Amino acid sequence: KRQSYAIPSSDGASGVINADKGLGVSNEFTLSASGELDNGMTWSYAQDIDGATVQDDAKLTLTGGFGTVGVFIHEGGLDTDNTASQSVVSRPSDTSYNEGMFDTFDLGGHNTLQYHTPADLLPFGITAKIAYAPAASSAASINSYKATGSANLGTFTASTAAFNSTAAPFGQTSIMGKTATHYQVKAAPIDGLTVGADYLDYDGVVNSTTQSPESGSYYATYAAGPFSVGYSKNFTAFAINAYSGDLTESVEGTKYSVAFNVNDNLSISYENEESNPDNQTATTANYTLEATGIQAAYTMGGMTLAIAQNEFTNAQYTNGLNTV
């Protein structure tokens, strides 16, 4: 489990987002069970309990020589946009400050059926996964085995022209369309090198006549001795009905990071993340949100002490809203 002490501040010209110091402890745990069938196949079940003491993410999988099949409830996202991160604490955009960085759409917030290939089936360490959301227009719910469906209208929420909220930076979320399919491929072609990509496609998105929604990313990492580096790109196109004002139509992101193991106990890292939105016209100015982090972690047995200094430029895609 983790505990943290956060000290936010800001120096931007577009307003001050100073907040009081934050102190917290991990407030979620997982209940799990697994076993083996008479035919040699294995099964696994997991259920998360979150801070509100309610059932959260869940999954039930069956694994054999054919690979893994499973039902994933509100988890099992296949996006790879953050897989390359080498930060020793966490990505700069995944800390206590809600800077609102948008990456890609993902089915981790949906209920999905998934298939994963066996780890040793293909050469060069190639593995593939596919997730299918049969009701993409509905948010995931923690269903029992008696779950029933609801009306699937295939609609979507229009994107906004500027920042909307940290939960939905540009208004539109992955909850849209009648169905959605997410593909992921990873490989380890040579020692130290890993590469991968994902692509998410929607079907039956009603009235997305000007632009259909899609998103994806690719990444690469390389490790040699005490050094490791990572790089990734991500792209998202929002569903658009027709020109209406000046909606955000796409977001492109770039991330790179490097880590160094000073010794068996101490590691340091640097990461830079950028997210650049693009609108239908130049009427609305776009500002690139940038997050950088310098971090260090020291491990003693089963305990890790870590410190991070993260900086944000144009937080919430707002010009001059800079924080530390």
Question: What positions do the PLM features span?
Answer:
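Outer-membrane beta-barrel proteins
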Residues: 1-324
